[in-house]
Amino acid sequence: MNTRLACVFLFCLIAPLAAAEKPNIVVIMTDDQGWGDLSVNGNTNLSTPHLDSLARDGVSFERFYVSPVCSPTRAEFLTGRYHPRCGVHATSNGGERMNADEQTIADVFKTAGYATALFGKWHSGTQVPYHPNARGFEEFYGFCSGHWGDYYSPQLEHNGQPVKGEGFMIDDFTRRATDFMNRQKGTGKPFFLCLSYNSPHSPMQVPDQWWEKFANKEITL
């Protein structure tokens, strides 16, 4: 009985969406950022006004489950399933790879007629069939490994081809994502964009303006 009610409820939610115009969707993911790494959650050592605004004016999930490490969390986001079911059990030595037959959120949007793109960190496999271009993302600019040793103009890739990054990686990924959205404006095609930042993961490099802002700041507990 509960299953039937759940299905009816789901149908009532989905039916209006099917008839509505397809919205553009942007997902922004940060790396190794904890719940307490936001000023909106009481951290007085940081200043995160834009994220605070999203939390105050949008929807905030305050009771949720997420894996404490990288690749398992990414697998769960990409598939909507617990990471062991996807074949992901670690962050290296092949344990970061989702099963090749898993359907990703990008696959679903691509099938629905969306342009799909990922800019930034992947960490779910480096080669086909694990590469983002083989997992539903038509456009990929970034890196596939777990982290990068230098955040300034490093070696990256664009749709499988090696390229050199342009400046601070976070800014580079943001520019590329913005360019993608601007290109999509005149196409009449909706887009699904994942902007996957590698920060604040170590080595925790930042532009001088942000370093200088906090260089001599005392940490309060």
Give the role of each language-model region.
Residues 6-16:
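Bacterial N-terminal signal peptides
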Residues 2, 17-221:
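Formylglycine-dependent sulfatase
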